[in-house]
Structures are given as C-alpha cells and as structure tokens.
C-alpha cells in the first residue's frame, strides 16, 4: 500500500458547507491552515460558490474577462477559472509529510476525481503537462476539462484545491481563457453523461475518494489518453 501523504494519522475532518462566498471561504482556509500549523486537524471543506472568477498567480492580462467583469486575485497556483452553482469545490487543508512532494499531492487529488468519474460511468484521463481531470478528445472535439486543480502549499500545509463541474452553467467559461488553455474545452458530468448529475449526487463519493487518495488507500495509477481508466459501470 502507498504511504499516506499526510503528516497526521488522525481522520480528516470533512465539512460540507453548502454555498459560501469565495472570499469568506478563502479566509476560512487561512484560519484552518493557521490552526493546522498549531497542531489542529486536517480538514476537507466541500462547498459551492456564488458565481465568481478567480485568478491564480500566473494569469496573463489577455486571459481575463473581455468585458471587464471583476476577478478575485488569489495566491494559488495556476491561472484564471470560474466557480459557481453546480460546481463542487474542495479545499483540503492538510499537513503534508516530509519530504514535501506537491506533484504527488496534486496527482492524488486527480486520482480521487478520476475514480469518482469512473464510478459514474465517465472515462477520464490526465493530460501530460496539464493538471486536472480530462475527457479525451473524440469525434473532432478537443480534450475537455471536467475538474480543475490549483493549490498552494505554505508551512507544509495545503490550501485551495479542486473544482468538479457537475451541472454548472458552462457558458460562464466563454468569457475567459480557462486555466490559460486556449486549445481545449471545458465540460461537466451532466454534459458528458447526458443525464443530470448534481453536486449532492457526488459529494459523498468525492469526500471518500479524496481521503482515500491522500491516505494511500487509493493508489495513483497511470491515466493517460492511451491508458484510460476502466469504467466502473
């Protein structure tokens, strides 16, 4: 079994918060990170945001909304993205074990979300050089991102996290260059599976998969376009 990436052996405190303003959730993350550094528990926040654009540290001016829509600038990695209703956002506030391996941490988050998609009947992959979880291009369509990941690690503690598109309004992504990637698309579980998949339908399985991946119960496997994860259905 793969070792846990966490420095604590205690269970992760999973909190389902409903809908939370982005700035309020960001402050809550910082407060929880301070508490974790002081010896508090690892925490996983699961929630939705009112519609908002957020920009990571590498966002370029031309990737922002063309109409001047306000953007919240953050201290996470990555570029610009959208959060809003119908998208499950997860913020793991985790103390990482030494030696720190941020790439492994991101791969574990991807693994968890790939499993959730597979259990729903959707084959997803990793795309080399691009974080997140992707539906491979087919029938003339490009690769499509169904889950985005952008994290920050400070004092060996993680902040920010992932966003899984369930039944969100995909048109909101048209005003930006999502994650700075112009040659790929954005999709949702509902769009790909052609049936409604709401946040409430996946929140429990996401919580379980993330905890299992971080603790090594769910091992990281190869999920490239040439080695797709098998559907569980």
UniProtKB/Swiss-Prot annotation:
GO terms for molecular function: lipoyl(octanoyl) transferase activity. Pathway: Protein modification; protein lipoylation via endogenous pathway; protein N(6)-(lipoyl)lysine from octanoyl-[acyl-carrier-protein]: step 1/2. It is found in: Cytoplasm. Residues 38-218 form the BPL/LPL catalytic domain. Pfam families: LplA-B_cat. CDD domains: LipB. Residues 57-66 have a biased composition (Basic and acidic residues). GO terms for biological process: protein modification process. Its EC number is 2.3.1.181. Keywords: Acyltransferase, Cytoplasm, Transferase. Catalyzes the transfer of endogenously produced octanoic acid from octanoyl-acyl-carrier-protein onto the lipoyl domains of lipoate-dependent enzymes. Lipoyl-ACP can also act as a substrate although octanoyl-ACP is likely to be the physiological substrate. Belongs to the LipB family. This is Octanoyltransferase. The gene is lipB.
